[in-house]
Amino acid sequence: MFEGIGTAIVTPFKEGKLDIESYEKLLNFQINNQINAIIVLGTTGEAPNISLDEREILIKKAKEVSGNKAKVIVGAGSNGINHTIELIKNAEKNGADGLLIVTPYYNKPTQNGLYEYYKYISEHTDLEIIVYNVPSRTGINILPETVYKIASDCKNVKALKEANSSFEQINKDLLLLKELKDFKIFSGNDDTAFQLLASGGDGVISVASNIIPLQMVQMFNFIKNGEIEKARNIHFSYYKLFKNLFIETNPIPVKAALSIMGFINNELRLPLVPASESTMKIITETLKGCGVI
């Protein structure tokens, strides 16, 4: 499993179809700025709106561009086991280095149900698995104790992406899960990434690194080298950007930002729509304020 910064890459569209030219340009921007992993088909990649055929294209292109320079982790979670396994097999076939598996949304399983779900998945793939906790989207919060039990019993469950903003839960993750050998804890929120990393976390699965990959990598490296003040300076230099990338539903603001920067068209798939005029103004001012444009 990687450590460092993994970019939750957007999926560019042009007139309703995949925009592979823009996607490749964005991937090269990431690799050239030393990103450690590309997270394809996560929340930021609009995964629920992507067909199986399109998934193949996106995964293969990410592998082609990344080569041996960055891991390609594929979001392959759904709200039911059969569809999740289908997505996993698709990821395996197309060369994924690992899997990001979100807790099953809508069904609202118990903690025991979550344990059985991840155990079943673990038994049906040899790829390394990141458990993805994002209760604001799924309606369910997987507890640190449940993750500990899963990782203890499932040899290929290797990491947690924690997108619960509760510092109490983040601290419990760090206290409990660090007892596991070779288990990684990733921040799923850019605005609390500095705190998690400074407390012993292993990396960030980042939205902001679509825009500022090198700066996110530098922040991680400073913390790893014990240069906390330098990392803190980066964190607060871009804190407004971290917050404003969520003033509308992700990935609406980050796609707006990337369109302003000239990387992609400002296009999403329904039910998501482009940023409002007021949001576009805020994003433009934010990018100018932190020196991105």
Swiss-Prot record:
A biological process from GO: diaminopimelate biosynthetic process
SUPFAM superfamilies, per database record: Aldolase (SSF51569)
Site-annotated residues for Part of a proton relay during catalysis: 43, 106
Keyword Lyase: yes
Active site: 132, 161
Biological or metabolic pathway of the protein: Amino-acid biosynthesis; L-lysine biosynthesis via DAP pathway; (S)-tetrahydrodipicolinate from L-aspartate: step 3/4
Major enzyme class: lyase
Binding locations of pyruvate: 44, 205
Enzyme Commission numbers on file: 4.3.3.7
Pfam families the UniProt entry points to: DHDPS (PF00701)
GO molecular function term, any single one: 4-hydroxy-tetrahydrodipicolinate synthase activity
Record's subunit section: Homotetramer; dimer of dimers.
Family, per entry: Belongs to the DapA family.
UniProt-recorded name of the protein: 4-hydroxy-tetrahydrodipicolinate synthase
Organism: Thermosipho africanus (strain TCF52B)
Lineage: Bacteria, Thermotogati, Thermotogota, Thermotogae, Thermotogales
